[in-house]
C-alpha cells in the first residue's frame, strides 16, 4: 500500500485555487441506533474528547456506552430531525452555501470532524478542484481542545497523507470577534421584539471536564468573556443574565454552574421567566434543540418556572453570514 494518497491529474500551475472549509462536530447519517453507534464510536474514541487510557475507557465504551446510548440518542435525534436531514448538517451546509455566494472566487465547502461529509472526502474533492491553499474555520468561537483541536487534528491527519501538501491556515478562535458579538446582539434583540422577553437571560455553553480547564484549556474563560461582551452589547446588568455549561456526561467533575442544575434552582430563587441562548453553538443541533429547547423547558417548568423561551442559534442569519465573510477575509490575507 502506498504511503500517500494519489494526486489529482493537474499540473502544479493548476493547483493554485483557494478554498475555505467550515468544519463542525458531526452528526449521524440518520436518527437510528444503527447510524448513531458508529458516529458515537468515532467521537468517543478520540483522545481529544475522552482523555482516559484505552485500557480503562474502552471496556466502558464498548461494554456500556455503545450498547445503551445509541438507542437513547436515536430517540432524541428523531425529535429534532428535519426532512432534509440532521439540523446541524442542514444549517452548516446553508452557511457554507451563503459564504460561497458572497465569495464566488473561492471554493467553499463544509465537513464534519466525525461523520459525513468527512474531512478526508472533502479535502480530496478540494484537491481535485485545484485547491492549493486552504483556510480552515472550525465552527467553534471559543477554543477547546476537544472541539477546535480535534477539528484541526482531522485536517492534519489528511495532510500527512498528501504527497503535495496544501498550504493551510486555521482560525483557532473568535470568541471576541466584533461581527460575531454584534450578530448575536441583533439576533436576540429581534427575537425579543417579536416574542417578548423574560426576566433573565441564560447563556448556555457546552461544558468541558474541570480537569481539562485545570490543565490549561482556555475554553471556560473564553466562554465567560464572550458572555460578558454580549451582555454589555445588550446593556444587561449582572443580575439580568447568567452563564452556564451544559451537556455533561460521565462521573468526572465538569465546569460549573451546570445548565441543568440551574433549570431546577432558578425558579426557587424567584426567577420564573427565563430566556436561553447558546452562544457557542453556531448551528442548531441535538444539544440545543432537544437538550435545551425541549428538555430544558420541561425541567424549568417542573421546578416552578412560568415562562421559558429558547432563542435559536445564529444558523444562516444574514448578520452572522456578514460576520463570517469578514472573518474569512481577515484570515485569508494575501490569499485572495
From Swiss-Prot:
Coiled coil: none annotated. It catalyses: heme b + 2 H(+) = protoporphyrin IX + Fe(2+). Its EC number is 4.98.1.1. PANTHER family: FERROCHELATASE (PTHR11108), FERROCHELATASE, MITOCHONDRIAL (PTHR11108:SF1). Keywords: Cytoplasm, Heme biosynthesis, Iron, Lyase, Metal-binding, Porphyrin biosynthesis. One of its GO terms (biological process) is heme biosynthetic process. GO terms for cellular component: cytoplasm. Fe cation binds at residues 206, 287. Its main location: cytoplasm. GO terms for molecular function: ferrochelatase activity; metal ion binding. It comes from Neisseria meningitidis serogroup A / serotype 4A (strain DSM 15465 / Z2491). It is found in: Cytoplasm. The gene is hemH. Belongs to the ferrochelatase family. Pathway: Porphyrin-containing compound metabolism; protoheme biosynthesis; protoheme from protoporphyrin-IX: step 1/1. Gene3D superfamilies: 3.40.50.1400. PROSITE patterns: FERROCHELATASE (PS00534). It holds the Pfam family Ferrochelatase. This is Ferrochelatase. Catalyzes the ferrous insertion into protoporphyrin IX.
